[in-house]
A protein has these predicted regions:
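Amphipathic alpha-helical assembly/interaction segments
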Residues: 1-122
Length: 122
């Protein structure tokens, strides 16, 4: 697994994909109505940013319980993000279909990363 050879969290494929997803979310949400700037836009962006941020935190954490907590937060943010995308679609805030496959890929990679990291002794 790449995590064994990674020296920084930026070298992790799961972090790289999550970061690319955040950039896509920012671009997508730029087109939300101004009235959403402090609500859905903010919620969507915070949930998206939480994914790579939690992966980065888990990378440096040495305690397994802390690693598990960080990765669980990231996984929860994936699910929250899915809901926000559904809500944005239902509110008519543009087409986000290109984001769904990215989010699914991040979720799958995160699941595999969590299994490997939590099965590894440090």
């Amino acid at each position: 697994m790449e995590s064994a050879s990674a020296k920084t969290f930026q070298e992790l494929g799961v972090w790289q994909k999550a970061h690319q997803f955040v950039l896509a979310v920012y671009h997508y949400s730029d087109y939300f109505p101004q009235k959403e700037v402090y609500s859905l836009t903010s919620q969507l962006r915070r949930a998206a940013v939480s994914i790579p941020a939690s992966i980065a935190e888990a990378f440096k954490t040495t305690e397994q319980s802390d690693k598990a907590r960080c990765l669980n937060v990231a996984q929860g943010s994936v699910e929250a993000r899915l809901y926000y995308l559904i809500l944005a679609t239902d509110l008519g805030y543009g087409d986000n279909q290109q984001l769904l496959p990215q989010l699914e890929e991040v979720g799958r990679l995160l699941e595999r990363y969590a299994v490997v990291m939590l099965d590894t002794e440090f």
